[in-house]
Amino acid sequence: GNMLLSGNVNHGTITSSGQNAAGILCYTANMGDDWQLNIEDCENTADISSEGNVGGIAGFTAYYKTDEAGSSFNIQNCKNSGNLSSTTTNGYIGGILAVDGFMQTQTTIDSCENSGTISFTKSWVMQENELKTENDDGEKEDASLFTLSVMGGGIVGRIGEAVMLSVDADKPDGQEINKKDALVRISNCVNTGALSYEEPQKG
């Protein structure tokens, strides 16, 4: 099957208490083998906020298939200028796409632009013992490094297992960059939006 979203524009503010929100296409999952999904010449100018994942154009995509799917997903010539925010401490924000959860699906994002800000607005509260780490002598001391469970990107917030399944992903090689048979290709995209998050706090 084929699905095309072309020339769509959203100017209305979106506020979601659910898991996902996006300016054009919120959620796509298990679309089936040999499907082609294309989003082109679409634009979001409105602010979008959610308690979960947020994408300026597309929100959450998933097709958990580990063998050849014959499917494709393309976003081309799309723009987001709306400010994107999430109150989660376990989610993703992308100026164009929040989450690419397709596994064996050829995914292309080309000639897209994000100028909206990306912000995680909920502070990450930790207990006193979680804010400490153990040094080489086994003594507890204040931690100097934290790993937040949130990810934000000017173009894409998160790319899942497709990276592992792509062209020689386990063997870094400059010659493998831009291979046409790579599962995920992002090209000619620009981000000028700022990224911010709340610092961890003691609970």
Regions found by a protein language model. Give the residues of each.
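Surface-exposed loop/turn motifs in large extracellular/passenger domains
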Residues: G1-G203
